[in-house]
Each structure stands twice: as structure tokens, then as C-alpha cells.
């Protein structure tokens, strides 16, 4: 639980009231349960009592507990992708500037600098806007499955149009690094656009970074 709380506290700056949610697999019952932020709680003040234990069907162990309304997509990801141990969903300001614009497809499919490739992958999965709750879970499922079929890997960064981002990882530090790198990339994207035409990495340059054994080692260390 401590890692989930640390994840929440690190990603809390800029959040208002109950914005965002975080979760992590239960280390004692890894195969069939996870802990998630309770509805109405805040990332910056999140404590152990604010976490709700849920089955992989999104039903809480204690029916009196009320998990985040986004529990459905957390449950679906854990149930279908064993490599994911932590999930963070936030609404970062610079990234949402892009996700609320026609530039969102460009931001998802192009890359600006090597560390963006390392932390956020060659491409990101872009999810069209859907109402939070079951409609959003269904759209996330549809787009992730399509992305995995097309790209051959699970997305490190999931972008939600007019909403926010989802990052996943084997450790909470993966989620932190991916979330912070996304926001840094968004700030650079907006700044570069203001200065003129953006100069992106080429596909060859992106693949060279992605396949570099030194970068693979850095990923493992981080």
C-alpha cells in the first residue's frame, strides 16, 4: 500500500479536490485483487484508509466501500495484462491542452526527443472521448486491443481525448516516470509549436533509440 500512496502523493501537484486516481495490485493476492483510491478522496492527502480493495471484476471486497468511479478500466487492465502492477490516471495541464485540441493525434503518434521514446514508447494509445465510467472502460478496451494488434506492444502511455492520461507499470516508479515525461513532452510540444514547425524524430531515429541495449538497461534500472 505504501507504494500506492507514494504514487498518489508524487502525482498530486496541480490536482483539484478528487481529481485523478491510482491503484496497485495486492501483493498478497496478486492474481485476483487490487487496491484503488476511494471515491471522493484526494491524491495529495491519500492515506491507507482511503484505499479500497477490489476483485478483478471491479467489485469491492467490502460492499460498503465506494471505489473510484474509474475502477472499471483499472480492473480490466489488471485482469488482462499480468505485467501491469500499478496504474495512475491524472489530468496534467499541459497534456490536456493538447488533448483538448486537434493536435492530439500528432502528439500520440510522433516523438520529439529520445527520453520520450524511452519512457512513453514509440507511440501512445489515443482514446476518443467517452463518458467516465463504463463507456470509458469500453472505449479504452477497444483502443488498447487495437493498439496491441497494430503495434505489437502494450502502450506505456494512454491518452484520453478531452480528459487526461493513464500510465501503467510493473512498479509505481514506472507510472511516475511515464506521467512526468508525458507532461514534460507536452510542454515542449506546445513550446515548439509556438516557435514554428515542430522538428520530430524520424522513424529511423525512434527505432534506434527503442532498440538500443543501453536504453533497455536504463529502463530496467529506472
What are these regions (language model features)?
Residues 1-222:
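Glycine-rich flexible loops
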Amino acid at each position: 500500500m505504501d507504494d500506492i500512496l507514494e504514487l498518489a502523493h508524487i502525482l498530486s501537484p496541480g490536482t483539484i479536490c478528487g481529481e485523478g486516481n491510482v491503484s496497485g495490485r495486492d501483493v498478497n493476492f496478486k492474481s485476483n485483487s487490487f487496491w484503488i483510491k476511494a471515491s471522493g478522496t484526494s491524491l495529495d492527502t491519500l492515506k491507507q484508509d482511503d484505499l479500497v480493495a477490489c476483485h478483478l471484476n471491479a467489485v469491492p471486497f467490502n460492499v460498503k466501500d465506494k471505489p473510484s468511479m474509474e475502477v472499471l478500466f483499472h480492473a480490466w487492465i489488471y485482469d488482462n495484462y499480468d505485467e501491469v502492477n500499478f496504474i495512475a490516471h491524472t489530468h496534467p495541464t499541459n497534456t490536456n491542452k493538447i488533448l483538448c485540441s486537434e493536435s492530439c493525434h500528432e502528439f500520440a503518434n510522433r516523438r520529439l526527443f529520445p527520453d520520450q521514446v524511452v519512457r512513453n514508447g514509440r507511440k501512445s494509445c489515443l482514446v476518443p472521448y467517452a463518458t467516465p465510467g463504463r463507456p470509458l472502460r469500453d472505449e479504452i478496451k477497444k483502443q488498447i486491443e487495437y493498439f496491441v494488434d497494430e503495434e505489437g506492444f502494450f502502450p506505456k502511455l494512454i491518452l484520453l481525448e478531452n480528459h487526461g492520461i493513464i500510465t501503467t507499470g510493473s512498479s509505481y516508479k514506472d507510472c511516475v516516470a511515464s506521467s512526468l515525461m508525458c507532461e514534460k513532452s507536452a510542454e515542449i510540444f506546445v513550446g515548439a509549436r509556438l516557435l514554428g514547425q515542430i522538428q520530430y524524430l524520424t522513424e529511423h531515429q525512434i527505432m534506434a533509440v527503442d532498440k538500443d541495449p543501453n536504453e533497455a538497461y536504463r529502463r530496467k534500472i529506472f
